[in-house]
Amino acid sequence: MERIDVKDRKILYYLSLNSRQSLQKIGRIVGLTKEVVSYRIKRMQELGIIENFYTDFILTPVGQTIYVRLYFNYQNITPSIKKEIIQYFVDTDEATIVASLEGNYDLMVIVIFPDIYKIHPYLEHMLMNYGDYFKERHAALYFIRNQYNPSFLLDSKTKKLEPHVHRLYQEISYDELDMNILKALDLNARMPITQLADELHSTVTVIHYRIKRLMKLGVILGFGVNINWEKLGYRFYHVEINLKQYHKRLDIVRYLMENPYFRSSHQLLGHASDLEVDFILENVMQLHEMMDNLSTHFPESVKDFKYWSILKTYKEQLFPTRHKN
C-alpha cells in the first residue's frame, strides 16, 4: 500500500470531478502551486496510483447502441482454458471490459453492439467454442448509471454532489472529427487542445468548439481519473440487492448517498437485481457492516444481496484500439 498525504488525496478528489481542469485551478483549491501539483500527479502516476485519465461519453455517437453485461461462472475449467477464454473476449472488438471477479461470479464481460440483432450471433459463436466450460451465464442490458464523487478521499463530512447521470441511449448526430476527438480523449482526457489539433489536423478554435458542443449535447459526460484503489488500501465492490419492497428503492439510494464510500448506482434490464450499487471500501468486512446497517434501517425492504470485486482487468476501453495484457 502506498502512502499519500491530505494534499494528494485532495488532488485525486478534484481530478475525479474534472480531470481536464487546469493544474493552476487545482492548485488554488488545494493550496499548492501548479508546479507542485504537476509533480505530485506525476509521482502518483509513477507509483501506479493514477492509472490514466478517462473521458465519459455515451456510446451512440460511435455507432454502438446496445450495452450488455455478461456474467459467467466456470465449470470443468483449467488455467490454460480460462486464459484462452479471457483472451477470446479481449480479442473481440465488441468487448469493452473483460475482468475476472471474486465473489458470486467468475468473469464479467461488457459488450456493445450496433443493434439488438447482433447480440445472439456473438453469444452463439462464443458458446459454440466455450459453452461447456460455463456452469452459469447471465446477460443484462445497461440503461443508466449514476456516478457520485468519492467524498471519502477528503473526509466523512464532505457531502455528495449531484451524480453524473449516464443515459446510455440517446440519438445524437456526429461526424468523423467528433469521433476522432472522442477516440483521442478516451486515451487521455488531459490531452492538451493544441496536441489534439495537431494530431487531428485541425485548429485549436475548432477543437475547443467541438468539445464544448459535445459536452452541451450530452455526448461527453465528464472527465475523470482511474485510480488503482488497491494501492491506497481500498477495493471496488459491486453489490446487487434484491428488495421485498421495490417502492423503497429511491429511499435506499438516498440513504446510500450519505455514505462517503458510495460510488455509483445502475439501472439494468434482464438478469439484474432490483438495485445495483458500487462502493470503494477497505475490505469485505466493511461491506457486510454497511449491508447490516442498511438492513437495520430498512428492515422490511431488503430481501438479500450478493457482491463481487474485480480480481484483474484484462481490457477496459470504449474504442477497440488498446488492450491490457
Q: What is the meaning of each model-derived region?
A:
Residues 1-325:
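A compositional/biophysical signature of low hydrophobicity enriched in polar/charged and small residues
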